[in-house]
């Protein structure tokens, strides 16, 4: 869950007002015994694990979680599980010193596991710090555990992360137990890293470039899905976590520089300005709501094709507009957004990694209906019109090559190569 800061984010609080939210740590905090001792001395909580003798159900749950932890990417889990078993066995004697030692040993193991589990996804662009995994300090982890009505259920809930993560991890672990090969596939760990930032609860949009599918989620359940067209191998759709606050009807399309250079300018040279005008293009002086339009006759199109002249070209709303009738923007540094398209034939293709990074959606009206709560009808007629959503909706663009099909784990082709190394983005698209 996003907590209080996340709730404020979804109600549309400006990004500037979010700056006070603390950034989560970006690397695993190596917890020492001193950290745990300091926690117990500072907060003086009731025992978490040994409140009325050893909490056998919680200890068994913790041991099982730690034994499975290599499949979360935490290789130290089995070693910590053995330490927990030994400490709990000694505490069952009722010896006060053994009980105190067990309490600290179990807390140390749990904190180390949670801190490893709640790392930000490598290579993901977080539009707001609050979208990163939260609650990784010793005090946050242990106070939350101490306050849980059922410690056993709390441990399971934290370890399961979210429904997508849980299904992938548990399927892989069950298959490993069946075969006896307990070494997790690096591809699995890469995929788990890419989905660990998804929320366990609430409403969000998931765009998966691995399968080129968009899924709508509510409290971990899939409500709807549709095909999308995502980035090519050369121009992949980035990993992004953001929040969508509005949609745009009848959007202008701003042509990327490389398409101006490779497509628009050469076509003007060979076909003349009639090509330019028939496609609804304008050369403008700036990216703004009211730019000045520049006469295309004054442009050196050969220089534009050569890349020595950089033009700002937009396409007016209409049937030829590359954005279709709806655009779904959200804050991010890569200028990525979702949008409609007039070309629906490509959705029939099996391989839909065909875009320049942005995401074309199969049914923009259906997505708009889910976001708005009613049929998307522009209040501004055919003019470009922005409509605010009643509440911000989190959106996650990720890349999932591990799939569970008929109860078995399978892998899709790694077209981006991100199963081997996290993404490094180009400075421009």
Predicted segments — roles?
Residues 1-17:
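Gram-negative bacterial Sec-dependent N-terminal signal peptides
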Residues 18-30, 108-112, 116, 131, ...:
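Well-ordered beta-sheet/strand-loop patches within structured domains
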Residues 18-128:
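Cationic-aromatic interfacial patches
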């Amino acid at each position: 869950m996003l907590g209080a800061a996340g709730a404020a984010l979804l109600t549309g609080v400006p990004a500037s007002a979010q700056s006070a939210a603390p950034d989560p740590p970006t690397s695993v905090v190596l917890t020492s015994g001193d950290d745990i001792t300091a926690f117990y001395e500072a907060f003086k909580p009731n025992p978490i694990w040994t409140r009325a003798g050893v909490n056998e159900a919680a200890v068994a749950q913790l041991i099982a979680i730690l034994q499975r932890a290599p499949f979360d990417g935490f290789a130290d889990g089995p070693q910590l599980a053995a330490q927990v078993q030994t400490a709990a066995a000694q505490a069952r004697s009722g010896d006060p010193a053994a009980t105190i030692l067990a309490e600290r040993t179990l807390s140390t193991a749990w904190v180390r596991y949670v801190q490893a589990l709640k790392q930000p996804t490598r290579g993901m662009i977080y539009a707001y710090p609050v979208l990163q995994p939260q609650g990784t300090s010793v005090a946050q982890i242990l106070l939350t555990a101490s306050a849980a009505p059922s410690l056993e259920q709390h441990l399971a809930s934290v370890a399961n992360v979210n429904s997508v993560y849980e299904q992938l991890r548990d399927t892989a672990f069950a298959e490993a137990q069946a075969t006896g090969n307990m070494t997790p596939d690096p591809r699995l760990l890469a995929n788990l890293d890419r989905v660990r930032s998804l929320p366990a609860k609430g409403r969000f949009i998931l765009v998966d470039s691995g399968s080129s599918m968009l899924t709508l989620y509510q409290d971990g359940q899939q409500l709807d899905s549709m095909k999308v067209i995502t980035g090519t191998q050369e121009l992949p759709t980035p990993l992004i976590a953001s929040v969508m606050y509005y949609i745009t009807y009848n959007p202008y399309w701003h042509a990327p520089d490389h398409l101006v250079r490779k497509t628009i300018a050469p076509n003007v040279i060979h076909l003349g300005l009639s090509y330019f005008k028939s496609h609804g293009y304008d050369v403008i002086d700036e990216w703004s709501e009211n730019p000045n339009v520049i006469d295309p006759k004054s442009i050196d199109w050969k220089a534009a094709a050569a890349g020595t002249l950089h033009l700002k070209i937009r396409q007016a709303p209409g049937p030829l507009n590359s954005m279709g009738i709806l655009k779904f923007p959200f804050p991010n540094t890569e200028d990525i957004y979702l949008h409609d398209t007039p070309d629906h034939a490509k959705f029939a293709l099996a391989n839909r990694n065909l875009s320049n990074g942005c995401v074309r959606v199969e049914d923009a009206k259906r997505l708009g209906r889910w976001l708005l709560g009613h049929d998307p009808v522009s209040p501004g007629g055919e003019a470009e019109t922005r409509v605010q959503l009643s509440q911000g909706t989190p959106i996650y663009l990720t890349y999932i090559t591990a799939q569970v099909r008929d109860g078995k784990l399978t892998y899709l082709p790694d077209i981006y190569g991100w199963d081997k190394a996290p993404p490094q983005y180009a400075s421009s698209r």
